Amino acid sequence: MRIKPLGDRVVIKRLEAEEKTKSGIVLPGSAKEKPQEAEIVAVGPGGLVDGKEVNMEVKVGDRVLFSQYAGNEVKIDGEEYIILRQNDILAIVE
């Protein structure tokens, strides 16, 4: 299934959390912090959003940092994604 976001929305997939701490302790699944770094898998067209022209600054494949509580989590074909607005993205990781 393909997902096509509307307006200034983007679809992201979280990157995997670290399995070990810096000191080498292996973390169980429940102790891992959800990462705030993700890869963009789909980008909306931008355009007129809330009466303002929005140009999309991100593209598919970009690695980004995003606000911890931003967007809506969805499950598609067994995979977890987050749909959020472009302004919830804090930075592009280069």
Curated annotation (Swiss-Prot):
Quaternary structure, from the entry: Heptamer of 7 subunits arranged in a ring. Interacts with the chaperonin GroEL.
Encoding gene, per UniProt annotation: groES
Statement: the UniProt record of this protein carries the keyword Transcription regulation: no
Chaperone in keyword set: yes
Species the sequence originates in: Clostridium botulinum
Its biological purpose: Together with the chaperonin GroEL, plays an essential role in assisting protein folding. The GroEL-GroES system forms a nano-cage that allows encapsulation of the non-native substrate proteins and provides a physical environment optimized to promote and accelerate protein folding. GroES binds to the apical surface of the GroEL ring, thereby capping the opening of the GroEL channel.
Molecular function via GO: ATP binding; metal ion binding; protein folding chaperone; protein-folding chaperone binding; unfolded protein binding
Cellular-component GO terms for this entry: cytoplasm
NCBIfam families xref list: PRK00364.1-2, PRK00364.2-2, PRK00364.2-4, PRK00364.2-5
A matching Pfam family: Cpn10
UniProt-recorded name of the protein: Co-chaperonin GroES
Family: Belongs to the GroES chaperonin family.
SMART domains: Cpn10
Cellular localisation: Cytoplasm
Keywords (A to Z) from UniProt: Chaperone, Cytoplasm
Alphabetized CDD domains for the sequence: cpn10 (cd00320)
GO annotation, biological process: chaperone cofactor-dependent protein refolding
